[in-house]
Swiss-Prot record:
This is Baeyer-Villiger oxidase mdpL. The keyword Acetylation does not apply. Pathway: Secondary metabolite biosynthesis. Baeyer-Villiger oxidase; part of the gene cluster that mediates the biosynthesis of monodictyphenone, a prenyl xanthone derivative. The pathway begins with the synthesis of atrochrysone thioester by the polyketide synthase (PKS) mdpG. The atrochrysone carboxyl ACP thioesterase mdpF then breaks the thioester bond and releases the atrochrysone carboxylic acid from mdpG. The atrochrysone carboxylic acid is then converted to atrochrysone which is further transformed into emodin anthrone. Disruption phenotype: Impairs the production of monodictyphenone, but still enables the synthesis of intermediates until emodin. Results in major accumulation of chrysophanol and its 6-hydroxymethyl shunt product aloe-emodin. GO terms for molecular function: oxidoreductase activity. The gene is mdpL. The keyword Oxidoreductase applies. Its cofactor is NADPH. It holds the Pfam family Questin_oxidase. InterPro entries: Questin_oxidase-like (IPR025337). It comes from Emericella nidulans (strain FGSC A4 / ATCC 38163 / CBS 112.46 / NRRL 194 / M139) (Aspergillus nidulans). Its EC number is 1.-.-.-.
Length: 446
């Protein structure tokens, strides 16, 4: 049954960075994931309040967390959660009608009904892959709404889908589909589809993401829209960028192009760009503490799942190309949304933290699992390890800014800058905005 969570030691994906978990660890993980599935809303608040329990538990699991660490992670995250909306069986039945289904997309109070509908569809077809293909990749009117929503709200639904696919869990896949269907839209569908049409009209091969960052910096109208005050994240996309500089960002984003022949390299390029944005968006030269941007962190944490989805031969090559193309384009959008920060390459290249020093990946995984966090740091570190593995063969390319041990340096930075912090000062939010740094001024020792 797709409503049952059953993580198996034989189905932990390819990005496991610890020994196979013992049976008691898997038993506890399944118990906690089932409680989450059966009782908790996928949104802890209506606007971009994403329940991270699945992300947190599964990531820590493959980084080697003990049962005690997993229970602590669950307990830390639980107080912010809320109960699922009520189930309405008659609505679940009506969702089989495509026109009715389409009318309910973006309605957050329909999450439980969407969840039960997708569970029933998976059980009826005895194939979660067929359901994902129809509702995400078929290019039907419904799929053309669901796929953009997978990226909305800082990539949370596609992270959830990626985890479900990685661990082969129909129940988690149903959660991801329901989350995307119920998610508010911030204009990603317009952005993606318009950029896609514009790219189709271009004959040239496309440009690198690093070069396109420079085009954003060199476009005053886009910089101004990205630095508007009073709007955060996706709300800035909907109310500023797509209102005041839509043509400019679409023109630039459409220049990132992926083909079947370039898919592997362009996936690596995207992973690399995300790490570069997260590590290099600093103001240490101006006397501020090192910090990682909250939204660039999400660009990184989601990046690993484009490696995972890219390995799925049941997804057509055409759709795997589209996945990466859209991800790179939205990463460019996020650079604008975060206020077009200056990027300090040298800081990343030479970074060394007081606590983490020369710590290895294995040592870092161990202390991250001890950290009281909602899973963002663990996800970030795991995604960077994947990035290092994927990008190694391409690092000679000029578009690959992050090379060698810089991956580990950025991972150490994530732990170093978040330990002994609270949720309000763990990350800098929109690193290109002057006001974002006001609480991170280095205090004089005089």
């Amino acid at each position: 049954m797709s409503s049952s969570i059953n993580i198996l030691s034989t189905k932990l994906g390819q990005n496991i960075y610890a020994q196979t978990p013992p049976s008691q660890t898997l038993t506890l993980t399944n118990h906690l994931l089932q409680k989450n599935h059966d009782t908790l809303h996928i949104f802890f608040r209506n606007l971009n309040g994403h329940n991270h329990l699945v992300h947190n538990l599964l990531t820590r699991l493959v980084l080697g967390a003990t049962p005690e660490q997993l229970q602590t992670a669950y307990d830390d995250d639980l107080p912010t959660q809320r109960a699922m909306p009520p189930l309405v069986p008659s609505i679940v039945e009506r969702l089989s009608d495509n026109s009715y289904f389409e009318s309910q997309i973006t309605q957050i109070d329909q999450y439980t009904n969407f969840l039960r509908f997708f569970e029933a569809e998976i059980d009826r077809r005895d194939s979660w892959k067929d359901v994902v293909i129809e509702y995400v990749f078929s290019r039907s009117p419904i799929a053309e709404k669901i796929l953009p929503l997978m990226y909305d709200g800082a990539f949370h639904s596609i992270i959830h889908l990626g985890l479900g696919v990685e661990f082969e869990q129909p129940g988690i896949i149903a959660e991801a589909l329901a989350q995307a269907a119920a998610h508010d839209s911030f204009g990603t569908d317009y952005f993606f589809l318009t950029a896609e049409k514009r790219a189709a009209g271009r004959n040239e091969e496309g440009e690198t993401l690093v070069n396109l960052l420079q085009k954003i910096r060199d476009t005053p109208k886009l910089v101004e829209a990205g630095r508007v005050q009073g709007l955060i994240g996706t709300m800035k996309m909907r109310k500023s960028i797509l209102v005041n500089a839509a043509d400019e960002i679409i023109d630039i984003a459409s220049r990132f192009k992926v083909t079947e022949e370039t898919l592997a390299r362009k996936t690596a390029e995207m992973l690399n760009l995300c790490a570069y944005l997260a590590g290099a968006s600093q103001r240490t030269k101006d006397g501020y503490e090192p910090k990682i941007d909250f939204f660039f962190m999400h660009c990184v944490t989601s990046s690993i799942f484009f490696s995972i989805l890219g390995r799925q031969d049941w997804i057509s090559m055409r759709d795997r190309v589209r996945l990466v193309e859209w991800k790179g384009r939205l990463d460019l959008m996020w650079y604008a949304l975060c206020g077009v920060p200056e990027l300090d390459f040298e800081f990343v290249r030479t970074y060394r933290g007081e606590r983490t020093g020369t710590m290895s990946w294995k040592e870092l995984f161990a202390i991250v699992n001890e950290q009281h966090d909602d899973g963002h740091v663990a996800k970030f570190v795991r995604a960077l390890k994947n990035g290092q593995e994927v990008c190694g063969q391409f690092e000679d390319g000029e578009e690959f800014m992050v090379k060698g041990d810089m991956w580990l340096r950025i991972a150490r930075m994530a732990y170093e800058t978040t330990i002994e912090t609270n949720m309000q000062n763990r990350w800098v939010v929109m690193a290109g905005m002057d006001g974002a740094w006001k609480d991170f001024k280095v205090q004089s020792s005089d």
